[in-house]
Amino acid sequence: MAREREQRHEREDRDNTFVDKLVHINRVAKVVKGGRRFGFAALVVVGDQKGRVGFGHGKAREVPEAIRKATESAKRALIRVPLREGRTLHHDVHGHHGAGKVILRAAPAGTGIIAGGPMRAVFETLGMHDVVAKSFGSSNPYNMVRATFDALKNQDSPRSVAARRGIKVSQLQSRRRVEDAEATD
């Protein structure tokens, strides 16, 4: 049973080439009777640059081991994010975690990734090419990454919106064109 699971994971790894980015590494200390024991905590973001991304946290006595654990954790926590034209968001979204808040805005082609630190790593591994992001409140990398994931999970694709409303995607997009035409007049 365990062997089948390992083989399935190996197949998935061969099919999907993942890009991983180290977001943050932190030295932590455990106080014991004889003094302090130092270790490391790593935050890693992993994605296939085709709309799947995940983040993981790993702790160990050595940095490479902490990074390996974080990468494995991130691969187990992948989410799929719908992208418009494979490059940007479908609509503007907000997300928060703890005291960290983020606003993600869809951007026209050629804009690039305008985002700070931890958010940039998420977008690059996700495969997003055009996005404008702003963070407020906490600048803690863990909170920023979790807030970014919260925002990405809040995004709806036109297909899911149309299904929820009980209409076709073409009807949804034709309404958008009419609204855009009225706004320019």
Swiss-Prot record:
GO terms for molecular function: rRNA binding; structural constituent of ribosome. Residues 157-185 are annotated as: Disordered. Residues 176-185 have a biased composition (Basic and acidic residues). Gene3D superfamilies: 3.30.160.20, 3.30.230.10. Signal peptide: none annotated. Disulfide bonds: none annotated. Keywords: Ribonucleoprotein, Ribosomal protein, RNA-binding, rRNA-binding. One of its GO terms (biological process) is translation. SUPFAM superfamilies: dsRNA-binding domain-like, Ribosomal protein S5 domain 2-like. GO terms for cellular component: small ribosomal subunit. Pfam families: Ribosomal_S5, Ribosomal_S5_C. Residues 18-81 form the S5 DRBM domain. Belongs to the universal ribosomal protein uS5 family. Part of the 30S ribosomal subunit. Contacts proteins S4 and S8. With S4 and S12 plays an important role in translational accuracy. HAMAP family: Ribosomal_uS5_B. The N-terminal domain interacts with the head of the 30S subunit; the C-terminal domain interacts with the body and contacts protein S4. The interaction surface between S4 and S5 is involved in control of translational fidelity. This is Small ribosomal subunit protein uS5. It comes from Xanthobacter autotrophicus (strain ATCC BAA-1158 / Py2). The gene is rpsE.
